[in-house]
């Protein structure tokens, strides 16, 4: 509907600027943003990923796929990461991480739910708060 990724990102940038948005928070956003887009929003785009990056991350690692990979690998601990977004999938600077135990009877679904409840839902608001506080300080000092 937007005419491809470049047109989508152009329209999104215009809307974000028009609304004077200072922070973009992604959760379940399955589009890889371009280097041009992320460069316009340095240290202003947050993403939550359902693993302890650098484990089980990158292109194609999302949703249940992450938890399936963790269970296949036999890890005893997984978790979630909030990081800044750059042009590399899950490659931006890490802000916060929280570990979650993998239980012997876990399925991808039970693990996904526990990681969301015990890590993602706690980390993402806290990271947004930390970055927002920094943005406010920068604006006051400008």
Which residue stretches match the model-derived regions?
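One-carbon transfer enzymes
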Residues: 1-142
């Amino acid at each position: 509907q937007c005419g491809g990724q470049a047109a989508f990102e152009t329209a999104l940038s215009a809307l974000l600027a028009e609304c004077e948005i200072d922070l973009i928070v992604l959760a379940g956003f399955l589009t890889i943003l371009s280097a041009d887009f992320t460069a316009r929003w340095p240290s202003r785009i947050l993403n939550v990923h359902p693993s302890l990056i650098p484990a089980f991350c990158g292109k194609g690692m999302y949703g249940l796929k992450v938890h399936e990979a963790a269970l296949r690998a036999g890890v005893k601990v997984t978790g979630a990461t909030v990081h800044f977004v750059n042009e590399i999938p899950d490659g931006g600077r890490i802000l916060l991480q929280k570990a979650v135990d993998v239980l012997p009877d876990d399925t991808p679904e039970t693990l996904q739910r526990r990681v969301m409840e015990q890590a993602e839902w706690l980390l993402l608001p806290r990271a947004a708060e930390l970055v927002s506080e920094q943005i406010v300080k920068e604006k006051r000092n400008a």
